[in-house]
């Protein structure tokens, strides 16, 4: 079994992104969600976590322990029973991934916070579970840079012991924030959310992705890194030019079909010039801080864009309110930005 740790910044986007990625990688097995921990059968955890914006870790689940009782007064007994159950389980198996040639460390991750889980002694669990693994495998303990990180995941009514297969690249999202790019304009979406929106659009390598309000190119960067072919436009020539500057910085110009200055209401004609009838996905974030009349124009453009999307393709966009389109709404997520702005992330599928 495989376990996924969902990021806690948003209640639903991480799960929606995971379900999209499971679909992208053609997974058809069972899915069990325990709030921020999701269990599947043998799904490609490394590929999914590497590509994700909001999936923190992918695990190979070794042991599952369901609590029969739960009380702060009984916490020592419950932890003892858990440790002894794991010891009995390990006695009858070859512990996966770890042997005397590998180093390991055990770390507790509490994904549920209440008085009971707060009272659990993480250090004790790490020490005792680590000792059991040591006796079984004769592997070396390395607390700073282990070959294998063993996670003890503590949920509301369930404990898991898992080997970490992959961790999300937090450094990428820190080092690639919009203000650190060669061309920057205020109001850009953070790359973590941009990556998640590209994933929600089920973008695959070789797909044609369009951003008709491309701004500084955030969505096109994330789609290009996946291997998609890129089309972008913006009514502001500085933005279109800045997008190309940023795509060049990421060595993605070879993925570009065309980026140009263009009013998005002429996208259909733009695609015709490129001999492209329809695209696989549109991912975009139209401008918000504009007059009521301009907002009306943008909403009309949003209503016409499904015409250039292939059947079964996706239209994923952010807007300050819910927009009804003649497509299948598969997801709607609210992202609080500040007092005056809540982004509504729409995930539409063309049926």
From Swiss-Prot:
One of its GO terms (biological process) is tRNA methylation. Its main location: cytoplasm. The keyword Cytoplasm applies. Monomer. NCBIfam families: TIGR01177 family methyltransferase. One of its GO terms (molecular function) is tRNA (guanine(10)-N2)-dimethyltransferase activity. This is tRNA (guanine(10)-N2)-dimethyltransferase. Keywords: Cytoplasm, Methyltransferase, RNA-binding, S-adenosyl-L-methionine, Transferase, tRNA processing, tRNA-binding. Residues 57-165 form the THUMP domain. Its EC number is 2.1.1.213. Catalyzes the adenosylmethionine-dependent methylation of the exocyclic amino group (N(2)) of guanosine at position 10 of various tRNAs. Acts via a two-step process that leads to the formation of either N(2)-monomethyl (m(2)G) or N(2)-dimethylguanosine (m(2)(2)G). It is an enzyme of class 2 (transferase). It comes from Methanocaldococcus jannaschii (strain ATCC 43067 / DSM 2661 / JAL-1 / JCM 10045 / NBRC 100440) (Methanococcus jannaschii). Belongs to the methyltransferase superfamily. Trm-G10 family. Coiled coil: none annotated. It catalyses: guanosine(10) in tRNA + 2 S-adenosyl-L-methionine = N(2)-dimethylguanosine(10) in tRNA + 2 S-adenosyl-L-homocysteine + 2 H(+). The lineage of its organism: Archaea, Methanobacteriati, Methanobacteriota, Methanomada group, Methanococci. It is found in: Cytoplasm. PANTHER family: THUMP DOMAIN-CONTAINING, TRNA (GUANINE(6)-N2)-METHYLTRANSFERASE THUMP3. GO terms for cellular component: cytoplasm. The gene is trmG10. SUPFAM superfamilies: S-adenosyl-L-methionine-dependent methyltransferases, THUMP domain-like. The keyword Cytoplasm applies.
């Amino acid at each position: 079994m495989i376990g996924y740790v969902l990021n806690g910044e948003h209640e639903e986007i991480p799960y929606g992104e995971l379900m999209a990625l499971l679909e992208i990688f053609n997974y058809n097995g069972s899915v069990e969600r325990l709030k921020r921990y999701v269990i599947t059968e043998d799904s490609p955890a490394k590929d999914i976590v590497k590509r994700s914006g909001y999936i923190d870790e992918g695990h190979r689940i070794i042991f599952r322990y369901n609590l029969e009782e739960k009380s702060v007064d009984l916490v020592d007994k419950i932890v003892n029973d858990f440790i002894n159950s794991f010891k009995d389980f390990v006695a009858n198996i070859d512990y996966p991934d770890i042997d005397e040639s590998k180093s390991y460390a055990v770390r507790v991750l509490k994904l549920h916070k209440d008085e009971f889980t707060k009272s659990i002694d993480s250090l004790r669990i790490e020490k005792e579970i680590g000792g059991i693994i040591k006796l079984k495998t004769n592997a070396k303990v390395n607390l700073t840079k282990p070959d294998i990180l063993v996670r003890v995941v503590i949920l509301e009514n369930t404990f898991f012991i898992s080997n970490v297969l992959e961790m999300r690249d937090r450094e990428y999202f820190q080092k690639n924030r919009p203000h650190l790019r060669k061309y920057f304009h205020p109001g850009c979406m953070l790359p973590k959310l941009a990556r998640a929106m590209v994933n929600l659009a089920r973008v695959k390598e070789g797909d044609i992705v369009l951003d008709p309000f491309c701004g500084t190119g955030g969505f096109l960067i994330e789609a290009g890194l996946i291997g998609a072919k890129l089309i972008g436009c913006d009514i502001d020539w500085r933005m279109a030019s800045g997008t190309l500057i940023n795509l060049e910085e990421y060595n993605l110009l070879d993925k570009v079909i065309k980026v140009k200055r263009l009013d998005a209401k002429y996208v259909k004609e733009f695609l015709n010039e490129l001999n492209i009838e329809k695209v696989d996905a549109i991912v975009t974030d139209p401008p918000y801080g504009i007059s009521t009349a301009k907002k009306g124009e943008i909403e009309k453009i949003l209503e016409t864009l499904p015409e250039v999307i292939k059947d079964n393709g996706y239209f994923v966009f952010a807007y300050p309110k819910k927009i009804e389109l003649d497509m299948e709404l598969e997801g709607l997520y609210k992202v609080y930005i500040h007092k005056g702005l809540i982004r509504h992330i729409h995930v539409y599928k063309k049926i």
